[in-house]
């Protein structure tokens, strides 16, 4: 899956947002590549390949582009997947389960500006979750950036969620988790909008310390760049800065 780019042209998934108000009626989903260097990360230069589009809080249309590809890295002997909109994490968790990198009842360490836990009564059955094709369709044509975690909990791949969204959450993590041994049932789910300029009041080194501690404990890592919520060049810059010493 994700072995060929495509457009979503119907009012589903993230394309549902303000669909009737937008002149552009399609969103671009790139293909994934295996990357060995951060130098392979390239920004999108095709203006027709919009990653996310909606009206912002000032009611102005915000058109957002991402990178040319999704990227799969091997870092410190574990897999890290980098992509744009956060609901894609849902697919990659199930892909990792199918490859026996993870199994069920994982603890999700969710580091993000937003909770992503809206419950919109979207459910994937246990039988359908074993089909990557059905998981792919559910991810790309049903879920959106706000509601992908609850269906994963209902199905069982995620058991509990640790929400890290502010300074207190970061400090609580260090107090409660940093001294614990590595756990084979942890997924790190990082949104780089945690580094958006409006959150600069949260200490960068504190963010980095928690992210790297969670990274070391996790069996699998999903990272999104959230084009609607943070400048993409800033997001990639922070991604590189945090993980530069982990790349194999």
Annotated model-derived regions:
Residues 2-248:
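Conserved alpha-helical scaffold segments that buttress catalytic/binding sites
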